[in-house]
């Protein structure tokens, strides 16, 4: 641990020394330090057994937070952990903020770690916070746990992570960006410009229940995540955008213009129960999600748009301009019961979702438009002009019971969605087409005040189904 490290200069962190010589680790990183730098890390527990032809069996790390470390140039904990993994190449530029940019703490592992696989980076154990969380520094980011990987030829079976969030001023990368950015196949140039006086970062996430079982040749079986949202002013990525931004096949150009007076970010999502079993060659078996919505002013993406925006086959250019004084965002969705089993060659078996609607003023997408906007086959450019002082949005949907069984070569087995609920057994999907959709009901829109053009609930449900453009 580095406690009360004083003075300026350039030095290497503990994790940088550990990871510096691992195979295939290449990366150029630039950081301009703020004040009160990053804490060191330690490892606990039995390391995993290595496999073959790859880097396997790395244990997690723990840190105590930040303790009066003064200015200088050094790397963060998560950057050091993931910086040298095979296939991870990226150029990063960060410009420090003011008044206390503090670094990220590490993670802790407890118990027996996983056994490595072959021909790739496998067998990294997840880390969990059991007992005493990391010790606070000053306005620092602490208590983040790691992730677990396993399977073959791809990044599979990642569990969620938990944390308490970040509290400081200045520009930094979110937790999920640090976790996903250096995994095999993750390449990206990231540039962030710091805000001032209160740009607070993204909260961590967590999973509940049994994560999904990964398939092959793709990223499958990711469990849901939970979070409480972000708070502050400035331009930043949403939680789900960070999670999905680097998935295979996920391409998109996004432009966001920040608002003023409290642009607060997106909440995470959570899964309960047993997630669906993954299929093959695509991303399958994603469970539903819940969230509390977003509050604040400025341009931002909805929760569901962030979730679906980067799925394989989903390509879009999204432009949003923030409103003013109370643009409140979209609520998430939740699934209960047993999700559907995934099919093959497409995205199948998605369960229904619930939400409470949107409230506020400004330009935003409705809940159902966000849900259906990026499904395979659904392509469209959307432009909406926000109303003023009270355009209240559409209610979400919920499904209960047994979802339909997925078909093949298309998107099948989607359960019906209602403004209120659906009960009973849904239809069984067929083949080579979109089959088995149950009927939908809606309650309409309530309390629409002000000026603006918007679609009804049922239009949003039906507008973006595959084959309808």
From Swiss-Prot:
KW Repeat (keyword) present:
yes
Q: Where is the composition biased (Basic and acidic residues)?
A: 233-254, 302-312, 361-382, 451-469
Alphabetically ordered keywords of this record:
Repeat
InterPro entries for this protein:
Dehydrin, Dehydrin_CS
GO BP annotations listed: cold acclimation; response to abscisic acid; response to water deprivation
Q: What segment(s) does the record annotate as region 14 X 14 AA approximate repeats?
A: 49-441
Report what the protein is called. Cold shock protein CS66
Which species? Answer: Triticum aestivum
